[in-house]
């Protein structure tokens, strides 16, 4: 595997979970798959926390995951949790597409991520900001591979 070189590239962790869009508005929150299916009933704890965000509305892109004892996302554990096995499902948010009625999709990614980080609680066990690193892609890939991450 190779990664782009240079200091202008953003590098993020790849999580092994379900990518979902969380929509918040009018005191409600919903979860949708990439294909538009409403999976809100599958992520009640994520949506309960999303309802508490101090926004009029937001559309947040991220990954629903179960983190194992080693701190790695575990897809099988997530599938088991969705079938009723006891586990905490976390949501790693990595992009903010809409905020308080404003479409942010034409804004630079770093600006969107800054706004996203500002609306997420600093210490929340379920809603988490997915951080990024600017540049040093080869070094980061090497470290991720050494740690058994994707």
Residue ranges and their predicted role:
Residues 1-150:
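Catalytic cores of nucleic-acid ligases and guanylyltransferases
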């Amino acid at each position: 595997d190779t990664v782009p070189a240079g200091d202008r590239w953003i590098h993020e962790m790849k999580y092994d979970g379900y990518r979902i869009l969380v929509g918040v508005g009018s005191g409600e929150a919903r979860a949708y798959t990439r294909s538009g299916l409403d999976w809100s009933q599958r992520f009640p704890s994520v949506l309960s926390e999303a309802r508490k965000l101090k926004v009029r509305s937001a559309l947040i892109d991220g990954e629903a995951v179960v983190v194992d004892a080693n701190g790695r996302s575990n897809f099988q554990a997530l599938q088991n949790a969705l079938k009723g096995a006891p586990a905490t499902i976390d949501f790693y948010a990595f992009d903010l597409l809409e905020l308080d009625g404003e479409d942010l999709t034409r804004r630079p990614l770093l600006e969107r991520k800054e706004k996203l980080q500002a609306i997420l609680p600093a210490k929340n066990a379920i809603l988490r900001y997915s951080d990024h690193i600017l540049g040093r892609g080869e070094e980061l890939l090497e470290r991720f591979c050494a740690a058994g991450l994707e």
